[in-house]
Amino acid sequence: MNVLFAGGGTGGHLYPAIAMAGELRKLVPDVVISFVGTTGGIEATEVPRLGYRLHLIPVRGLKRGRALADIVANIGVIADFVAALGRAAALIAREAPDVVVGTGGFVSAPLLLAAQLMRKKTLIQEQNAFPGVTTKLLAALASEVHLSFDDARRFIRNKKRLFVTGNPARSFALPQQVAAREYFALSEERPTLLVFGGSRGARSINNAVLEGVDLITASANLVWQTGALDFERIKSKMQPSPYIWVAPYIEEMGVAYGAADLVLCRAGASSLAELTNLGKPSVLVPYPYATGDHQRHNARALVTGGAAMLVEDDRLGQQASIKNILELLHDKERLKRMGAASRKLAYPDSAHQLALRIISLAKKN
Protein backbone atom coordinates (compact mmCIF):
# COMPACT_ATOMS: atom_id res chain seq x y z
CA MET A 1 0.00 0.00 0.00
CA ASN A 2 1.28 3.44 -0.96
CA VAL A 3 -0.03 6.61 0.71
CA LEU A 4 0.90 10.20 -0.10
CA PHE A 5 0.22 12.92 2.49
CA ALA A 6 -0.09 16.52 1.31
CA GLY A 7 -0.19 19.21 3.96
CA GLY A 8 1.86 21.45 6.16
CA GLY A 9 3.10 24.97 6.48
CA THR A 10 2.15 24.92 10.15
CA GLY A 11 2.06 22.23 12.81
CA GLY A 12 -1.73 22.37 12.81
CA HIS A 13 -1.79 20.98 9.27
CA LEU A 14 1.25 18.70 9.56
CA TYR A 15 0.84 16.87 12.89
CA PRO A 16 -2.54 15.26 12.06
CA ALA A 17 -0.87 13.79 8.96
CA ILE A 18 2.06 12.53 11.03
CA ALA A 19 -0.37 10.95 13.52
CA MET A 20 -2.22 9.15 10.72
CA ALA A 21 1.06 7.99 9.19
CA GLY A 22 2.13 6.55 12.53
CA GLU A 23 -1.12 4.60 12.86
CA LEU A 24 -0.80 3.30 9.30
CA ARG A 25 2.67 1.96 10.10
CA LYS A 26 1.23 0.06 13.08
CA LEU A 27 -1.63 -1.42 11.06
CA VAL A 28 0.28 -2.08 7.81
CA PRO A 29 4.00 -2.40 8.63
CA ASP A 30 5.08 -2.53 4.97
CA VAL A 31 3.10 0.57 3.95
CA VAL A 32 4.97 3.08 1.77
CA ILE A 33 4.43 6.60 3.11
CA SER A 34 5.69 9.90 1.74
CA PHE A 35 4.85 13.54 2.30
CA VAL A 36 4.57 16.56 0.04
CA GLY A 37 5.31 20.03 1.38
CA THR A 38 7.07 23.34 0.77
CA THR A 39 10.54 24.54 1.68
CA GLY A 40 9.23 27.25 4.00
CA GLY A 41 6.91 25.03 6.05
CA ILE A 42 7.55 23.16 9.28
CA GLU A 43 7.45 19.92 7.28
CA ALA A 44 10.78 20.74 5.61
CA THR A 45 12.62 19.80 8.82
CA GLU A 46 10.08 17.77 10.80
CA VAL A 47 9.20 15.13 8.18
CA PRO A 48 12.81 14.04 7.42
CA ARG A 49 13.56 14.03 11.16
CA LEU A 50 10.81 11.43 11.61
CA GLY A 51 12.20 9.27 8.84
CA TYR A 52 9.61 9.89 6.13
CA ARG A 53 10.37 10.81 2.52
CA LEU A 54 9.51 14.40 1.62
CA HIS A 55 8.80 15.84 -1.84
CA LEU A 56 8.92 19.62 -2.16
CA ILE A 57 6.66 21.60 -4.49
CA PRO A 58 6.83 25.44 -4.57
CA VAL A 59 3.39 26.96 -4.03
CA ARG A 60 2.02 30.11 -2.38
CA GLY A 61 -1.31 31.17 -0.96
CA LEU A 62 -3.56 33.88 -2.37
CA LYS A 63 -3.39 37.37 -0.90
CA ARG A 64 -6.76 38.24 0.63
CA GLY A 65 -6.46 42.01 0.39
CA ARG A 66 -7.96 44.17 -2.36
CA ALA A 67 -5.02 46.51 -2.84
CA LEU A 68 -3.43 46.69 -6.28
CA ALA A 69 -0.26 45.08 -4.93
CA ASP A 70 -2.29 42.10 -3.69
CA ILE A 71 -4.05 41.72 -7.03
CA VAL A 72 -0.75 41.81 -8.92
CA ALA A 73 0.78 39.33 -6.48
CA ASN A 74 -2.16 36.96 -6.96
CA ILE A 75 -1.49 36.80 -10.71
CA GLY A 76 1.87 35.30 -9.84
CA VAL A 77 0.26 32.99 -7.27
CA ILE A 78 -2.13 31.62 -9.89
CA ALA A 79 0.76 31.02 -12.29
CA ASP A 80 2.63 29.23 -9.50
CA PHE A 81 -0.44 27.10 -8.77
CA VAL A 82 -0.72 25.96 -12.39
CA ALA A 83 2.97 25.00 -12.32
CA ALA A 84 2.46 23.23 -8.96
CA LEU A 85 -0.49 21.32 -10.41
CA GLY A 86 1.76 20.03 -13.19
CA ARG A 87 4.47 19.02 -10.72
CA ALA A 88 1.86 17.33 -8.54
CA ALA A 89 0.53 15.31 -11.48
CA ALA A 90 4.05 14.23 -12.42
CA LEU A 91 4.75 13.21 -8.82
CA ILE A 92 1.55 11.18 -8.58
CA ALA A 93 2.28 9.45 -11.88
CA ARG A 94 5.77 8.56 -10.63
CA GLU A 95 4.87 7.50 -7.08
CA ALA A 96 1.53 5.80 -7.96
CA PRO A 97 -0.09 6.25 -4.53
CA ASP A 98 -3.20 4.24 -3.67
CA VAL A 99 -4.55 7.16 -1.63
CA VAL A 100 -3.68 10.86 -1.46
CA VAL A 101 -4.50 12.46 1.91
CA GLY A 102 -4.82 16.25 2.20
CA THR A 103 -4.57 17.92 5.60
CA GLY A 104 -4.48 21.58 4.59
CA GLY A 105 -1.86 24.17 3.86
CA PHE A 106 -1.04 25.66 0.47
CA VAL A 107 0.47 22.46 -0.94
CA SER A 108 -2.59 20.28 -0.34
CA ALA A 109 -4.71 22.00 -3.02
CA PRO A 110 -2.61 21.14 -6.12
CA LEU A 111 -1.94 17.60 -4.87
CA LEU A 112 -5.59 16.85 -4.14
CA LEU A 113 -6.81 18.40 -7.39
CA ALA A 114 -4.22 16.55 -9.46
CA ALA A 115 -5.11 13.28 -7.72
CA GLN A 116 -8.82 13.84 -8.32
CA LEU A 117 -8.26 14.63 -12.00
CA MET A 118 -6.19 11.44 -12.26
CA ARG A 119 -9.00 9.45 -10.59
CA LYS A 120 -6.98 8.59 -7.51
CA LYS A 121 -8.63 7.94 -4.15
CA THR A 122 -8.46 11.09 -2.03
CA LEU A 123 -9.22 11.77 1.61
CA ILE A 124 -9.50 15.28 3.05
CA GLN A 125 -8.95 15.76 6.78
CA GLU A 126 -10.22 19.17 7.94
CA GLN A 127 -9.09 20.36 11.37
CA ASN A 128 -11.23 23.44 11.91
CA ALA A 129 -14.91 24.11 12.60
CA PHE A 130 -14.83 26.57 9.68
CA PRO A 131 -13.38 24.57 6.76
CA GLY A 132 -10.58 25.99 4.66
CA VAL A 133 -10.94 27.00 1.02
CA THR A 134 -9.34 23.78 -0.26
CA THR A 135 -11.79 21.63 1.68
CA LYS A 136 -14.83 23.57 0.52
CA LEU A 137 -13.77 23.60 -3.13
CA LEU A 138 -12.57 20.01 -3.43
CA ALA A 139 -14.92 18.21 -1.03
CA ALA A 140 -17.38 17.35 -3.80
CA LEU A 141 -14.71 15.41 -5.71
CA ALA A 142 -13.07 13.72 -2.71
CA SER A 143 -13.50 10.02 -1.99
CA GLU A 144 -14.06 10.94 1.66
CA VAL A 145 -14.06 14.13 3.74
CA HIS A 146 -13.36 13.87 7.46
CA LEU A 147 -14.25 16.73 9.80
CA SER A 148 -13.06 17.47 13.32
CA PHE A 149 -16.22 19.29 14.41
CA ASP A 150 -19.81 18.28 13.72
CA ASP A 151 -20.66 21.98 13.29
CA ALA A 152 -18.47 22.06 10.15
CA ARG A 153 -21.01 19.92 8.26
CA ARG A 154 -23.09 22.99 7.40
CA PHE A 155 -20.25 24.48 5.35
CA ILE A 156 -19.89 21.42 3.08
CA ARG A 157 -22.48 21.25 0.30
CA ASN A 158 -21.98 17.63 -0.67
CA LYS A 159 -22.93 15.61 2.42
CA LYS A 160 -22.09 12.28 0.79
CA ARG A 161 -18.95 10.55 2.05
CA LEU A 162 -18.78 13.07 4.91
CA PHE A 163 -17.57 11.85 8.31
CA VAL A 164 -16.83 13.41 11.70
CA THR A 165 -13.79 11.64 13.11
CA GLY A 166 -12.10 14.37 15.15
CA ASN A 167 -8.61 15.76 14.85
CA PRO A 168 -5.59 13.52 15.52
CA ALA A 169 -3.67 14.97 18.45
CA ARG A 170 -0.67 14.19 20.59
CA SER A 171 -1.40 11.67 23.33
CA PHE A 172 -0.24 12.20 26.90
CA ALA A 173 0.04 9.97 29.94
CA LEU A 174 -1.04 12.35 32.69
CA PRO A 175 0.71 12.08 36.05
CA GLN A 176 -1.19 12.53 39.29
CA GLN A 177 -1.91 16.20 39.91
CA VAL A 178 0.16 16.28 43.12
CA ALA A 179 3.17 14.80 41.32
CA ALA A 180 2.71 17.20 38.41
CA ARG A 181 2.71 20.20 40.71
CA GLU A 182 5.80 18.88 42.47
CA TYR A 183 7.53 18.76 39.07
CA PHE A 184 6.96 22.51 38.70
CA ALA A 185 7.72 23.13 42.42
CA LEU A 186 4.27 24.65 42.99
CA SER A 187 1.85 24.63 45.91
CA GLU A 188 -0.23 21.44 46.17
CA GLU A 189 -3.12 23.28 47.82
CA ARG A 190 -3.66 26.02 45.26
CA PRO A 191 -5.52 25.57 41.96
CA THR A 192 -3.30 25.84 38.88
CA LEU A 193 -3.81 27.89 35.73
CA LEU A 194 -1.92 26.70 32.65
CA VAL A 195 -1.29 29.39 30.02
CA PHE A 196 0.14 28.96 26.53
CA GLY A 197 -0.25 30.52 23.12
CA GLY A 198 1.44 27.94 20.93
CA SER A 199 5.16 27.32 20.52
CA ARG A 200 5.73 30.92 19.44
CA GLY A 201 3.51 32.34 22.16
CA ALA A 202 0.74 34.92 21.88
CA ARG A 203 1.60 38.54 22.66
CA SER A 204 -1.89 39.61 23.78
CA ILE A 205 -2.26 36.63 26.12
CA ASN A 206 1.20 37.25 27.56
CA ASN A 207 0.45 40.93 28.11
CA ALA A 208 -2.84 40.17 29.86
CA VAL A 209 -1.30 37.57 32.15
CA LEU A 210 1.64 39.87 32.93
CA GLU A 211 -0.79 42.65 33.81
CA GLY A 212 -2.78 40.35 36.09
CA VAL A 213 0.03 38.19 37.45
CA ASP A 214 -0.18 39.60 41.00
CA LEU A 215 -3.91 38.97 41.08
CA ILE A 216 -3.43 35.43 39.79
CA THR A 217 -0.64 34.46 42.18
CA ALA A 218 -2.47 35.88 45.18
CA SER A 219 -4.58 32.71 45.22
CA ALA A 220 -3.38 30.34 42.47
CA ASN A 221 -0.41 28.67 40.80
CA LEU A 222 0.61 29.71 37.30
CA VAL A 223 2.33 27.50 34.71
CA TRP A 224 3.13 29.77 31.79
CA GLN A 225 4.58 29.09 28.35
CA THR A 226 5.45 32.49 26.89
CA GLY A 227 6.93 31.43 23.56
CA ALA A 228 10.54 32.14 22.65
CA LEU A 229 9.97 35.66 21.30
CA ASP A 230 8.41 36.99 24.50
CA PHE A 231 10.26 35.11 27.21
CA GLU A 232 13.05 37.58 28.02
CA ARG A 233 10.64 40.54 28.04
CA ILE A 234 8.24 38.74 30.37
CA LYS A 235 11.00 37.46 32.63
CA SER A 236 12.52 40.93 33.04
CA LYS A 237 9.21 42.41 34.20
CA MET A 238 8.23 39.68 36.67
CA GLN A 239 8.89 39.54 40.38
CA PRO A 240 10.12 36.18 41.70
CA SER A 241 7.28 34.06 43.10
CA PRO A 242 7.02 30.50 44.44
CA TYR A 243 3.67 30.21 42.67
CA ILE A 244 4.93 30.78 39.11
CA TRP A 245 6.71 28.49 36.67
CA VAL A 246 7.52 30.29 33.43
CA ALA A 247 9.45 29.14 30.35
CA PRO A 248 9.62 29.87 26.62
CA TYR A 249 8.46 26.33 25.84
CA ILE A 250 7.09 23.44 27.91
CA GLU A 251 8.88 20.24 26.98
CA GLU A 252 6.77 18.04 29.29
CA MET A 253 3.34 19.16 28.14
CA GLY A 254 1.68 16.08 29.63
CA VAL A 255 2.94 17.08 33.07
CA ALA A 256 1.68 20.64 32.53
CA TYR A 257 -1.78 19.36 31.61
CA GLY A 258 -1.67 17.08 34.64
CA ALA A 259 -0.98 20.01 36.95
CA ALA A 260 -3.68 22.24 35.45
CA ASP A 261 -7.19 22.78 36.76
CA LEU A 262 -7.92 25.25 33.96
CA VAL A 263 -6.20 26.09 30.66
CA LEU A 264 -5.99 29.55 29.05
CA CYS A 265 -4.98 29.38 25.39
CA ARG A 266 -5.77 30.14 21.75
CA ALA A 267 -8.44 28.12 19.92
CA GLY A 268 -6.28 26.30 17.40
CA ALA A 269 -7.65 22.92 16.35
CA SER A 270 -4.72 20.89 17.70
CA SER A 271 -4.90 22.49 21.14
CA LEU A 272 -8.64 21.89 21.35
CA ALA A 273 -8.21 18.25 20.37
CA GLU A 274 -5.69 17.84 23.20
CA LEU A 275 -7.97 19.61 25.70
CA THR A 276 -11.01 17.49 24.87
CA ASN A 277 -9.05 14.22 24.79
CA LEU A 278 -7.84 15.02 28.31
CA GLY A 279 -11.18 16.39 29.52
CA LYS A 280 -9.70 19.75 30.48
CA PRO A 281 -11.88 22.87 30.96
CA SER A 282 -10.56 25.93 29.19
CA VAL A 283 -10.74 29.66 28.61
CA LEU A 284 -10.29 30.23 24.88
CA VAL A 285 -9.00 33.41 23.27
CA PRO A 286 -9.46 33.11 19.49
CA TYR A 287 -6.70 34.63 17.38
CA PRO A 288 -8.57 37.53 15.74
CA TYR A 289 -6.61 37.40 12.47
CA ALA A 290 -7.00 33.68 11.76
CA THR A 291 -8.11 32.90 8.20
CA GLY A 292 -11.90 32.92 7.98
CA ASP A 293 -11.98 33.62 11.73
CA HIS A 294 -11.79 29.84 12.11
CA GLN A 295 -10.53 29.98 15.70
CA ARG A 296 -13.75 31.67 16.79
CA HIS A 297 -15.74 28.86 15.15
CA ASN A 298 -13.54 26.30 16.92
CA ALA A 299 -14.02 28.02 20.27
CA ARG A 300 -17.78 28.27 19.88
CA ALA A 301 -18.01 24.52 19.35
CA LEU A 302 -16.51 23.98 22.81
CA VAL A 303 -18.46 26.82 24.42
CA THR A 304 -21.74 25.46 23.01
CA GLY A 305 -20.79 22.04 24.36
CA GLY A 306 -20.25 23.49 27.85
CA ALA A 307 -16.52 22.77 27.86
CA ALA A 308 -15.05 26.27 27.61
CA MET A 309 -15.44 29.98 28.23
CA LEU A 310 -14.64 32.42 25.40
CA VAL A 311 -12.84 35.72 25.98
CA GLU A 312 -12.26 38.13 23.10
CA ASP A 313 -8.63 38.98 22.39
CA ASP A 314 -9.15 42.73 22.89
CA ARG A 315 -10.92 42.21 26.23
CA LEU A 316 -8.53 39.75 27.82
CA GLY A 317 -6.36 42.54 29.23
CA GLN A 318 -9.24 44.04 31.20
CA GLN A 319 -9.07 43.32 34.91
CA ALA A 320 -12.67 42.08 34.85
CA SER A 321 -11.67 39.30 32.46
CA ILE A 322 -8.83 38.13 34.71
CA LYS A 323 -11.21 38.20 37.69
CA ASN A 324 -13.75 36.11 35.77
CA ILE A 325 -11.05 33.58 34.90
CA LEU A 326 -9.95 33.38 38.54
CA GLU A 327 -13.55 33.01 39.68
CA LEU A 328 -13.88 30.03 37.35
CA LEU A 329 -10.53 28.62 38.50
CA HIS A 330 -11.78 28.52 42.09
CA ASP A 331 -15.21 27.04 41.23
CA LYS A 332 -14.50 23.31 41.58
CA GLU A 333 -18.03 22.16 40.70
CA ARG A 334 -18.16 24.24 37.53
CA LEU A 335 -14.70 23.03 36.49
CA LYS A 336 -15.83 19.46 37.05
CA ARG A 337 -18.89 19.95 34.82
CA MET A 338 -16.82 21.64 32.12
CA GLY A 339 -14.22 18.87 32.25
CA ALA A 340 -16.90 16.22 31.76
CA ALA A 341 -18.38 18.21 28.87
CA SER A 342 -14.92 18.57 27.34
CA ARG A 343 -14.36 14.82 27.38
CA LYS A 344 -17.72 14.23 25.66
CA LEU A 345 -16.45 16.25 22.69
CA ALA A 346 -13.31 14.14 22.33
CA TYR A 347 -12.27 11.76 19.57
CA PRO A 348 -9.35 10.02 21.29
CA ASP A 349 -8.95 7.36 18.58
CA SER A 350 -9.16 9.82 15.68
CA ALA A 351 -5.82 8.87 14.11
CA HIS A 352 -6.68 5.17 14.29
CA GLN A 353 -10.11 5.63 12.71
CA LEU A 354 -8.67 7.75 9.92
CA ALA A 355 -5.97 5.17 9.26
CA LEU A 356 -8.66 2.50 8.92
CA ARG A 357 -10.52 4.67 6.39
CA ILE A 358 -7.32 5.16 4.36
CA ILE A 359 -6.77 1.40 4.30
CA SER A 360 -10.38 0.86 3.23
CA LEU A 361 -9.98 3.33 0.35
CA ALA A 362 -6.72 1.71 -0.76
CA LYS A 363 -8.44 -1.68 -0.96
CA LYS A 364 -11.00 -0.27 -3.41
CA ASN A 365 -8.37 0.35 -6.09
From Swiss-Prot:
Catalytic reaction equation(s): di-trans,octa-cis-undecaprenyl diphospho-N-acetyl-alpha-D-muramoyl-L-alanyl-D-glutamyl-meso-2,6-diaminopimeloyl-D-alanyl-D-alanine + UDP-N-acetyl-alpha-D-glucosamine = di-trans,octa-cis-undecaprenyl diphospho-[N-acetyl-alpha-D-glucosaminyl-(1->4)]-N-acetyl-alpha-D-muramoyl-L-alanyl-D-glutamyl-meso-2,6-diaminopimeloyl-D-alanyl-D-alanine + UDP + H(+)
GO molecular function: UDP-N-acetyl-D-glucosamine:N-acetylmuramoyl-L-alanyl-D-glutamyl-meso-2,6-diaminopimelyl-D-alanyl-D-alanine-diphosphoundecaprenol 4-beta-N-acetylglucosaminlytransferase activity; undecaprenyldiphospho-muramoylpentapeptide beta-N-acetylglucosaminyltransferase activity
The UniProt record lists the keyword tRNA processing: no
Primary location class: membrane
A single cellular component GO annotation: plasma membrane
EC number(s) on file: 2.4.1.227
Annotated positions binding UDP-N-acetyl-alpha-D-glucosamine: T10, G11, G12, N128, R170, S199, I250, Q295
The keyword Ubl conjugation is assigned to this record: no
Coiled-coil segments on the chain, per record: none
Top enzyme class: transferase
UniProt keywords, alphabetically: Cell cycle, Cell division, Cell inner membrane, Cell membrane, Cell shape, Cell wall biogenesis/degradation, Glycosyltransferase, Membrane, Peptidoglycan synthesis, Transferase
Membrane topology: Peripheral membrane protein
GO BP terms: carbohydrate metabolic process; cell division; cell wall organization; lipid glycosylation; peptidoglycan biosynthetic process; regulation of cell shape
Superkingdom classification of source: Bacteria
Localization, UniProt: Cell inner membrane
Pathway this chain belongs to: Cell wall biogenesis; peptidoglycan biosynthesis
A Pfam family this chain is assigned to: Glyco_tran_28_C
InterPro entries reported in the protein's UniProt record: GlcNAc_MurG, Glyco_trans_28_C, GlycoTrans_28_N
Task performed by this protein: Cell wall formation. Catalyzes the transfer of a GlcNAc subunit on undecaprenyl-pyrophosphoryl-MurNAc-pentapeptide (lipid intermediate I) to form undecaprenyl-pyrophosphoryl-MurNAc-(pentapeptide)GlcNAc (lipid intermediate II).
NCBIfam families associated with the record: murG
Similarity comment: family membership: Belongs to the glycosyltransferase 28 family. MurG subfamily.
Protein name: UDP-N-acetylglucosamine--N-acetylmuramyl-(pentapeptide) pyrophosphoryl-undecaprenol N-acetylglucosamine transferase
